[in-house]
Amino acid sequence: MAQNKPVKKIVLAYSGGLDTSVILTWLKDTYGCEVIAFTADIGQKEELSGLEEKGIKTGASKVYIQDLRLEFARDFIFPAIQGNAIYEMRYLLGTSLARPLIAKAMVEVAEKEGADAFAHGATGKGNDQVRFELGVKSLAPEKTIIAPWRIWSFGGRSDLIEYAKSKGIPVPVTAEKPYSMDRNLMHISYEGGILEDPYKEPDEKMFLLTTSPEKAPDAPEYLELDFEEGNCVAINGKKMNPLEIMETLNTIAGKHGVGRVDIVENRLVGIKSRGVYETPGGTILFLAHRDLESITIDRDTQHHKDKLSIEFAELIYNGHWFSSRMKAVRAFITETQRYVSGTVRIKLYKGICSVVGRKSQVSLYNPEMATFEKEELYNQKDAEGFINIYGLPAQETARLRKK
């Protein structure tokens, strides 16, 4: 439908790879309009080299490369950590968190440039098409969205290469990786290609952020993470901003082989997909933060938050970052973090991240109450009345059903 709708100026989510380079040219040919290429720097490092020059040569009227690393860490990764967001109990949502930020930044560029349409290179089988488009629909509902992979007749990579050569688009001369990869400040994800066999172990050469646990240092390393209201603010006593926290933890945890996960997940579109992830810094933050909550949040609130964390993760995974329900869930999470302040001691050793200590000035843990020795604060005789009342439904059900 978008193909038949006239547009004047398009903002394209651009990576500089084969797909988005072809899309850039295809958009100009198909719509006869100006195309602005947009790239978000969210920690992909060397992938940004030469991108502006390549975009202009491929036909973009302008190329925006925005450094969004601090915003990504502060406004997306850290709130996810506060909410203990983990999809299907395994995936820490590195890619899912990046997409709404990119959509938000593209909308801002579109408003500045007077663009009336957006385009992206996500395929019709994946989750990213949903995340990008829900972001745009939530922030700029009047804009047109163009998804070339759902429109054009190209069947795969060979068709794209043939089109690129016919249009003079530079085709990468390096050998194609036997899998797809997406990198940002939170993680690197690998999927497709040789990873589509869920029984086949990934090649060790694939991993870029983490050392093989077998080759990690033979001595453990200890870290102390300071938190204020659910956010990590210092490592080993040194104050840092969220970007510095992520970069530091990625380096240290990666050295010890921490943060690898190999899973088969359920995509929003109904397909099961194998993903291999490296999330070194995020793994440390997730474990440390959840542990600190255990001494700073009361039982009932914590149990409710644990249930809500599942919904929170699903909202992120499914692209609902800007929804009303997400705002309500985040408001609850923010309230629970008022007293999540303290220090967590972490031990890193050959792929394992262990919490070995925690303390807080506002801790709800009372050793005098918890002790198994004789104490005055807790009268064990009081437990009998509690059990009688608490167990009454079970007792009565059993008694009456025996009649």
From Swiss-Prot:
Signal peptide start and end residues: none
EC number: 6.3.4.5
Pfam families (alphabetical): Arginosuc_syn_C, Arginosuc_synth
Positions bound to L-citrulline: Y91, S96, N127, R131, S180, S189, E265, Y277
UniProt: L-aspartate binding residues: T123, N127, D128
Keywords, in A-Z order: Amino-acid biosynthesis, Arginine biosynthesis, ATP-binding, Cytoplasm, Ligase, Nucleotide-binding
MF-aspect GO terms: argininosuccinate synthase activity; ATP binding
Sequence positions that bind ATP: A13, Y14, S15, G16, G17, L18, D19, T20, S21, A40, G121
One GO cellular component term: cytoplasm
Gene Ontology biological-process annotations: argininosuccinate metabolic process; L-arginine biosynthetic process; urea cycle
SUPFAM superfamilies according to UniProt: Adenine nucleotide alpha hydrolases-like, Argininosuccinate synthetase, C-terminal domain
Annotated compartments: Cytoplasm
Family of this protein: Belongs to the argininosuccinate synthase family. Type 1 subfamily.
Subunit structure: Homotetramer.
Name this polypeptide is given: Argininosuccinate synthase
Originating species: Leptospira interrogans serogroup Icterohaemorrhagiae serovar copenhageni (strain Fiocruz L1-130)
